[in-house]
Amino acid sequence: MANILRKWVESDKREIARLGKIADKVQQYEDEYAALSDEQLKANTPKLKDRLAAGATLDDILPEAFATAREGAKRVLGLFPFRVQIIGGIVLHEGNIAEMKTGEGKTLTATMPVYLNALTGKGVHVVTVNEYLSTRDATEMGELYNWLGLSVGLNLNSKNSDEKREAYNCDITYSTNSELGFDYLRDNMVVYKEQMVQRPLNFAIVDEVDSILIDEARTPLIISGGAEKTTGLYIRADRFVKTLKAETDYKIDWPTKTISLTESGIRKAEKNFGLDNLYDTENTALTHHIDQALRANYIMLKDIDYMVSDGEVLIVDQFTGRAMEGRRYSDGLHQAIEAKEGVQIQDENKTMANITYQNFFRMYTKLAGMTGTAKTEQEEFREIYNMEVISVPTNKPVIRVDSPDVLYPTLDAKFNAVVEDIKARHEKGQPMLIGTVAIESSERLSKQLDEAKIPHTVLNAKNHFKEAEIIMNAGQRGAVTIATNMAGRGTDIKLGPGVTELGGLAVIGTERHESRRIDNQLRGRSGRQGDPGSTQFYLSLEDDLMKRFGSDRIKAMLDRFKVADDDQVIQSRMISRQVESAQKRVEGNNYDTRKNTLQYDDVMREQREVIYKQRQQVINEQETLKPVLMAMINRTITRIVQTHTQGDQKDWNLDALYAWVTANMIDPEKFKRSQLDGKSQDELIGLLAEMAETNFQQKNKQLGDDAQMLEFEKVVILRVVDSAWTDHIDAMDQLRQSIGLRGYGQMNPLVEYQEEGYRMFEEMIASIDDDVTRLFMKAEIRQNIRR
């Protein structure tokens, strides 16, 4: 481990030295640009654009562009980027991740690479985790960009298509990650090119990059339409699983959070639902509902995984502790939780388009990110996104004191100790930020502080709209703030008057998160910009992380320490190391899961790209889609004729071919069965192809002009493609759910999924050809298809 650390540090040092030389070139312009008038400085923007047009690269103009943005920031914002911020800016421009500690001015750092890359006119997206930050940064930094002659757009969920298009057409666009992804999906569902809002994805700088590209990497963005109702099954499955006994009827594997029925549970299910064999193929819908009811009742925990508010089940984000409005668990899990909690069960949805953040952000020509904590995940960033993580030095040294963890045998003992610590610090007036992992523990601690008469503020999913305001005041004398899982990222905690003398902000962690990165984020709230500060984590053997990983080894260590009393405490670096190794195991598991998800997603990604590319060709066509349409019809004719004319001519099934022709191409009164007799396979194909050509000419004549014919062709193709793609997404989802079971048959589930998925895709393409043929040939033309 020490070797790996040394390698990190040395490679970072070399990289910082290289970047430092480029920063020197930027700083050379400092005095010269300070002497320019406002008009002269602003004139740099068109000059730099002209140089790009004349063939210069972005790297060629970087020193002048960075120096221009830097001097502009000094005049407009009253902020002058430090040398370390210039280095951070170069890291971003090169498509990597700048790891910069809290309070080091990431927002200002980004202004230089944003300005430089916006000069190309291809668009730069600045991506934030919520709309509050997008709006704040677009407003504040927008002043600088506008002053320098660039346009700035803000893309919000509430905007209509025209407003969104305007925002995306700006040089610089601020948006949340989810809005970018949903706009991309919606753009690939439109019928007319003019309805699209985005330009091609050029360069994105992702703020809090670890939160978006790692914590939310597997979150699928889903656009869905209604599907069939199965409310009754959810309620029956829920009632049934509530009668089961742990261990006897079902088993839970906590590290993987999976649950399954035992033999006894299977027998009970068969008896309860009156079945001979629960796992018979016709019972798949029922087994699916039972599986989800088991997960809902015994794995999904209220106020940790989800919360109930106003009769609605809301998902709680495990990394921010916020309620995720409008998000629903897919595949019926949300309905199963609704049945468990006895609230109204909402209809299941059918997915019409979906993509994960991993695959969405990999579509940008260049991607960069910034965060206070990414080094622990650098392997993942390199392997999946091809981005290096560079630790940018702080402007002033960090003087915060990080104490070793303290460990208590029970939760009660731990929380009592936390309250005592808070009481002692509160008497001095030292401000405190107390981090909890779940809403449940923040409410428990809040109750204990009420009993101890210590005034405090709680920040969790239930009151996140006041978040920024609460966090901004957390550094004032006497402030006690409880926050779930580092809600409030992106908002600085500045120390109030007299707080430095009291030791700065004290951060108290009431539990270790399963990711070291989240713990580091909590620590990083204290000691910003060289301020004093301290951090202390309190743990207990009953913590979730301890229960799932590593408690046995730690218990054995406690025996060595001879801990008898429940309130006895141990503070030891050895404990901290054991906890870290437990966290590394969880992180390893999580990374493997994300990598595995990505391998499955890549199958869908390739298919999505094919479909979306074909859709784009159809939408962008200005003259005629006849070549595309007739190719589809001719492929169908060839395939159908070949199917019915195999082997010797006496074995051909011309009756079946005639039935297909009259059902799909032409009315029986216009075509006689005898017309198929005495022809070779090629002649039959030629006959039907000619029939299709005649039909095309008739429709063209009926419509009377090319523009109307083009509209008709577009409607036919897009209607069929969209319907087939929606069904295919659904089928691929079901395949993915079932494929895991094949692992037991000595087969590699991923290979099976790839092969089966490819076969299903081929079948879908063939069915698109079939449906387009039938729809086009059989359609009755009514006048005026103009939109």
From Swiss-Prot:
It is an enzyme of class 7 (translocase). InterPro entries: Helicase_ATP-bd, Helicase_C-like, P-loop_NTPase, SecA, SecA_CS, SecA_DEAD, SecA_motor_DEAD, SecA_preprotein_X-link_dom. One of its GO terms (biological process) is protein transport by the Sec complex. ATP binds at Q85, G103, E104, G105, K106, T107, D492. It is found in: Cell membrane; Cytoplasm. It catalyses: ATP + H2O + cellular proteinSide 1 = ADP + phosphate + cellular proteinSide 2. Its main location: membrane. It comes from the Bacteria. One of its GO terms (molecular function) is protein-exporting ATPase activity. It is a peripheral membrane protein. Gene3D superfamilies: Helical scaffold and wing domains of SecA (1.10.3060.10), P-loop containing nucleotide triphosphate hydrolases (3.40.50.300), SecA, preprotein cross-linking domain (3.90.1440.10). Keywords: ATP-binding, Cell membrane, Cytoplasm, Membrane, Nucleotide-binding, Protein transport, Translocase, Translocation, Transport. GO terms for cellular component: cell envelope Sec protein transport complex; cytosol; plasma membrane. Disulfide bonds: none annotated. Its EC number is 7.4.2.8. Monomer and homodimer. Part of the essential Sec protein translocation apparatus which comprises SecA, SecYEG and auxiliary proteins SecDF. Other proteins may also be involved. Part of the Sec protein translocase complex. Interacts with the SecYEG preprotein conducting channel. Has a central role in coupling the hydrolysis of ATP to the transfer of proteins into and across the cell membrane, serving as an ATP-driven molecular motor driving the stepwise translocation of polypeptide chains across the membrane. Belongs to the SecA family. This is Protein translocase subunit SecA.
